[in-house]
């Protein structure tokens, strides 16, 4: 498949950046050589050459009968031949060893060929980044999480700290002002003296802690076991601060494994889920009250099923307390009609159960309720529990979606029993906002957005809607809420007040977007804090704006590139401001009481990271943009240290490119791509093509219904632009990605058909979107019934095109519960039917989507690295069409290992 020419193609550079790195102050105790160096000798290059038959390399000797009949002349002739053969063998051995050393040397030189003689780029004479350092996290910046907590009487600036600290106790609440000797600060309060707790003679080792809102109790979790990406089970305990003692969450069943536990806002109750049923424990009693009773394999209460956990809430909870503690809202999920998909485990037993005797050699099979595109979805409904009446009830919503066409994406409690519910249709392109009144048990539809009609796009299932209570004395006569709205092609903040008003007050507007907004709201001042891309799609800065849309201004330094995130205290008077790049990351506590941020304390400066950066030869990052068909796309090029523009460099393209994702940003990051540039000496390019986020909805939504086409086109077009650069070897270009990036790698190779990219490496790829989960897929592709041609077009089907590449690699975890191994197996079958052989395949047993079972994660990256080196060393060219070689030289080489033994 040939790609059409772009209407316009241009590049422009907006800045250059050297270095980006991380981690621990101490120098690494690990060392690593480039994978394959010293191990890619000639005899290992041709893996398709079969070994000769036994005895084939032995010198010819006459039979014993002929020997007896011969004279001394014949005997001398024979001995002469033997001597000649031995001499020839010795000479061959010398040549072989010499050539072998030369081959190893040439590989080593190939890996280092771009490390010296540069006239631009990094001039550091330091060591290259090693793969060992990347895999063991030695380049990760140090960072701290601050757990802000509201005081029992609404005090601001309090935070929870955990860990032994000079006899101050294991778990404590500190006032941030006390660090500077502020006389108005609250006294530090110790919640837990020790990290280990005794309960009825048992020793408990908590792995997580949650203080109650009044700080009198602490909920403890022990013996945690992972379920899916976000969910887990464990044993829960209630710890009393005053007595420093603990009791089981459910005294009648202390060993029961709990899936979720949440404090009530009033600190006197805990709602929890066990065996998919919801329970209530009042601290005034040791009895546990069941809220639901019919939960089981197909019915979930208060926790999401697999697809809602993965694709909607990105968490393990769908339980929400009302602010006054009088009601609990929760989702009821019915999976009865959802088909099951079997995931096999060959070495491990995720269930924790031993197989029956005699069945130890059979794999454990976990049947997952997994709705693929077009299959029945779980039926999800909202229910409520009245704590005082001990009653479960539901409220009918007018003009609601049908059961099989409804996805509930957010629940937001207000005051006086009011609750906002955001839901979409199955294809996620119509949003409805409902207002429920739990006291009156009524509801109404207050807002509808048909996004399909607005721009042909979709609604992302985010949870950032913010309730704004009425405060007439402060200029807010009615309740309201903040939500993200589409305005002139970009996502901005809108303030809806009263709650049933469908037209917002626009707080932001322009050709930029807010990101996961709002971050915080100061109700006293009427100020909204948010992160946005106002300066550049690759940057994140902190801003504030008044609730009436006035006085929008940045709070971080926008005079230079920056990437920030922030965590505010309960009353918004303080915040943890985290600078993520492009320079060395740092974190500081700031005071927001004044018009400008006041820096109170730097809690991390990554000084050790700065020293580490000085010791290593890091890639230079060049941020640019390309314009393709009128769309401006962000690009970063990582150049090897000592970059020499007079040389010709191989180029690796790295991508993810999923809808609304972003890979090109200004965060400080040393990763596998950095290793490839620093140690292997290759250029690495990443372009966020159409479909990615934060450049406006026009750029994003064009891919809907035809995933892969425009994205691949943008990768190919950008690669062609790079191929024209004088320092790029256009005959050595590869592309790689994981998950959606794996799909995009194969789609790009398919669309390119060997014209631009010679190689590709795809990890855990989707190969047919009919095999992926319904909620994610249909959001971007519609249903298969609605868009059959789109599903056909976006699948990897053109094996002839893939055959035009030199070679490609596919890797998959055999127990991937997310992107099922079915995707790769179906692709392999298509390759077999087409007679395509120019690929390598590697499966990792018992590994999920992250591929980390046993030593798999390390092996993935070592395989990627060595495979790429072989590709750019032209090894895959040499094995493309193997033929038998019966020359004496090949026989000698094959016989050497046996002779050495």
Swiss-Prot record:
Subcellular location: Vacuole membrane
Disulfide cysteine pairs (residue numbers): none
Keyword Transmembrane helix attributed: yes
Active site: 739, 816, 849
Vacuolar side: 98-901
Chain segments annotated as transmembrane: 77-97
A GO CC term assigned to this protein in UniProt: fungal-type vacuole membrane
Domain of life, source organism: Eukaryota
Biased composition range(s): Low complexity: 1-22
Residues glycosylated per entry: 334, 625, 793
Reactions this protein catalyses: Release of an N-terminal dipeptide, Xaa-Yaa-|-Zaa-, from a polypeptide, preferentially when Yaa is Pro, provided Zaa is neither Pro nor hydroxyproline
Residue numbers on the Cytoplasmic membrane side: 1-76
EC main group: hydrolase
Region (Disordered): 1-67
SUPFAM superfamilies with a match to the protein in the record: alpha/beta-Hydrolases, DPP6 N-terminal domain-like
InterPro entries named among the record's database cross-references: AB_hydrolase_fold (IPR029058), Peptidase_S9_cat (IPR001375), Peptidase_S9B_N (IPR002469), Serine_Prot_S9B/DPPIV (IPR050278)
PANTHER family on file: DIPEPTIDYL PEPTIDASE 10, ISOFORM B, PROTEASE FAMILY S9B,C DIPEPTIDYL-PEPTIDASE IV-RELATED
Name used for this protein in its record: Probable dipeptidyl-aminopeptidase B
Organism of origin: Aspergillus niger (strain ATCC MYA-4892 / CBS 513.88 / FGSC A1513)
